[in-house]
From Swiss-Prot:
Belongs to the RimM family. The PRC barrel domain binds ribosomal protein uS19. Binds ribosomal protein uS19. This is Ribosome maturation factor RimM. The lineage of its organism: Bacteria, Bacillati, Actinomycetota, Actinomycetes, Mycobacteriales. Its main location: cytoplasm. Residues 96-172 form the PRC barrel domain. It comes from Mycolicibacterium paratuberculosis (strain ATCC BAA-968 / K-10) (Mycobacterium paratuberculosis). An accessory protein needed during the final step in the assembly of 30S ribosomal subunit, possibly for assembly of the head region. Essential for efficient processing of 16S rRNA. May be needed both before and after RbfA during the maturation of 16S rRNA. It has affinity for free ribosomal 30S subunits but not for 70S ribosomes. The keyword Ion transport does not apply. One of its GO terms (cellular component) is ribosome. It is found in: Cytoplasm.
Amino acid sequence: MELTVGRVVKAHGISGEIVVEIRTDDPAARFAPGNTLRAKPSRGGPERSCVIESAREHGGRLLVRLAGVTDRDAADALRGTLFVVDSAELPDIDEPDTYYDHQLEGLQVRTTGGRRVGAVAEVLHTAAGELLAVRDDADGAPREVLVPFVSAIVTAVSLDDGLIEIDPPDGLLDL
């Protein structure tokens, strides 16, 4: 499975740097100088390998210099490009109750009472913590509920069973 670790937003300056929107929990490791990332153009075209020459944080994003990208035109041509890695390349997580986003996405969510809530569509990372965006369109009307990914609410996660069990506070599922 391919995981997106960054997206090129725009060129920065005239020397070929690009602004990258971060989509990984460890940008320092993913965008370390010397690393090679697969780049998928947004406008179609062949995938290519890009070698990171340098990366630095800038306003919540990264300014990245790639080997062979030496001017603004070359950098601007990368706008919208996604940097991806294969999930098989990710290291195993040794901490209990810690997951990669892609492991949670698609899992079914049920309450401790057995009520179906939906499936995890996305894991949102906010300043206040992680939220599970749980979507359900079983009754014909698409619905999304944001569930805080905290132990007080998420009582069990079973990757083997494809299930997350929650004990939501009153009103959470009614919002």
